[in-house]
């Protein structure tokens, strides 16, 4: 076996190695296990508490282990006596004590912000999805867990671990020196989140609401890109059709692959990947 930290060390190094391979540079590389991030998360959490945005209660709901996400029953598909997500992932009913963020209080503020800042969420189709989701009604968000021990402990209640909504999203602030954002203020003011469409709700609903609740400004823009399929099929480990970036770069060249990925599909749309498509695009355009 391998400890969680050892496993994540290995995964982290894989990403660092890949960045070198694709000739990509970054000003910071942050991991949520770092001390600076734990400090930032605790300060952010305490700020929400000080602003009366967090309370302790009990959570009951449908939970997807794979997605690390809770679902409302109306979002699920019932098959026999079980419930499944749209991606056919089975969910489980979970009951546990949890801290909650008062997300429901920020429904109108979010809708007003979307209206006043029409370019905040891109592309437009994703913006419409988010607005529709918020208009359907927001429930308070569970932001802690007692069912696992890996993660950042809640101060004054060590039985609770901060959930991913806090732990993962706050890393954007950690990398800029939060709580002191003065030195890198311009970076936050011009910040653009480029994310997968599957995590748009977290970035365009939960995150802005928490930032508002913590009296912080919002990122300038959130751009949700689409998904790639592999010759018409969803890419997954179970299908064995995951594309090895090292293999494809070595076969066709880095610049060629980079050109294909940006040229083949309008940014924001879904696209289909195939070696035939790569060859056709390279031969036609380069």
Predicted features and spans:
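N-terminal Rossmann-like or analogous alpha/beta NTP/dinucleotide-binding catalytic cores
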Residues: 1-55
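Structured secondary-structure scaffolds
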Residues: 31, 36-40, 44-47, 86-286
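Short non-domain terminal segments
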Residues: 5, 13, 27, 82, ...
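Short, flexible segments with low predicted structural confidence
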Residues: 19-20, 81-82, 261
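Cys/His-rich short segments
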Residues: 51-107, 111
């Amino acid at each position: 076996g391998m400890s969680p930290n050892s496993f994540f060390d290995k995964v982290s190094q894989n990403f660092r190695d890949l960045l070198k391979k694709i000739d990509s540079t970054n000003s910071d590389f942050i991991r949520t296990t770092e001390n600076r991030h734990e400090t930032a998360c605790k300060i952010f959490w305490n700020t929400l508490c000080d602003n009366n945005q967090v309370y302790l209660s009990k959570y009951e709901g449908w939970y997807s282990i794979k997605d690390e996400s809770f679902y409302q029953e109306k979002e699920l598909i019932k098959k026999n006596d079980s419930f499944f997500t749209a991606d056919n992932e089975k969910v489980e009913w979970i009951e546990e004590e949890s801290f909650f963020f008062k997300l429901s209080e920020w429904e109108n503020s979010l809708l007003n912000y979307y209206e006043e800042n029409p370019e905040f969420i891109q592309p437009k189709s994703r913006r419409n999805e988010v607005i529709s989701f918020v208009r359907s009604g927001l429930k308070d968000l569970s932001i802690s867990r007692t069912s696992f021990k890996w993660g950042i402990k809640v101060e004054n209640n060590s039985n609770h671990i901060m959930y991913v909504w806090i732990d993962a999203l706050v890393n954007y602030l950690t990398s800029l020196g939060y709580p002191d954002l003065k030195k890198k203020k311009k970076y936050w003011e011009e910040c653009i989140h480029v994310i997968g469409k599957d995590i748009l709700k977290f970035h365009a609903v939960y995150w802005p609401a928490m930032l508002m609740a913590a009296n912080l400004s919002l990122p300038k823009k959130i751009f949700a890109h689409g998904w790639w399929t592999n010759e018409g099929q969803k890419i997954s480990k179970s299908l064995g059709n995951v594309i090895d970036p090292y293999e494809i770069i070595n076969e066709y060249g880095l610049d060629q692959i980079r050109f294909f990925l940006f040229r083949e599909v309008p940014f924001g749309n879904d696209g289909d990947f195939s070696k035939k498509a790569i060859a056709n695009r390279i031969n036609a355009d380069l």
